[in-house]
């Protein structure tokens, strides 16, 4: 009798997860909170120099052995899109239009820190041009009118279970 063990990891094309990352949404948020007050710097993803929005999210996820694309638009994963904000979990990425509220293009990204499951209101941590790394509520007028969508990078955004699932098959 031979036992075969296989591991399945999400196959999102632009997200590369470490072999056995056990990161949770709480881990992501905890790491992100360590950088509150870090200044905004366009094109930078270094905690000693500053962050822009996508540099911040890619840096935080990289600390959990998960590589994200460097742009906010590139970080959006259509296959894991969350259309109902009440379904958001800690660690999910939220996307907004850029400075022009008329644009339909993604221009800003943040990480969900808290969600009201009844109303869909959420707070998120992000690198703001004016405040650096900060926490903002989704109800703030500037962001409320620019919200586009969200996506889940971690399969266990709020849970403590690892995102890999071992499967066993007995071959006789």
Feature locations, PLM:
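Bacterial Sec-dependent N-terminal signal peptides
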Residues: 1-15, 19
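Catalytic cysteine-centered active-site loop
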Residues: 16-19, 38-90, 100-101
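Extracytoplasmic
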Residues: 35-37, 89, 107, 119
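Aromatic- and glycine-rich peptidoglycan recognition patches
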Residues: 16-20, 82, 106-172
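N-terminal hydrophobic or amphipathic helices/low-complexity stretches enriched
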Residues: 13-32
């Amino acid at each position: 009798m031979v036992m075969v063990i296989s591991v399945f990891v999400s196959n999102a094309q632009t997200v590369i997860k470490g072999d056995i990352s056990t990161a949770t949404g709480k881990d992501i948020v905890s790491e992100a909170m360590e950088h509150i007050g870090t200044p905004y710097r366009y094109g930078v993803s270094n905690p000693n120099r500053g962050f822009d929005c996508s540099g911040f999210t890619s840096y935080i996820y990289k600390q959990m052995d998960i590589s994200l694309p460097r742009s906010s638009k590139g970080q959006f994963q259509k296959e894991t899109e969350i259309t109902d904000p009440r379904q958001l979990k800690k660690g999910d990425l939220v996307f907004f239009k850029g400075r022009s509220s008329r644009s339909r293009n993604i221009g800003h990204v943040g990480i969900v820190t808290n969600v009201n499951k009844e109303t869909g209101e959420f707070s998120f941590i992000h690198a703001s041009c004016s405040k650096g790394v900060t926490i903002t509520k989704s109800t703030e007028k500037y962001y409320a009118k620019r919200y586009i969508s969200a996506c889940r990078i971690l399969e266990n955004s709020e849970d403590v279970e690892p995102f890999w699932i071992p499967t066993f098959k007995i071959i006789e």
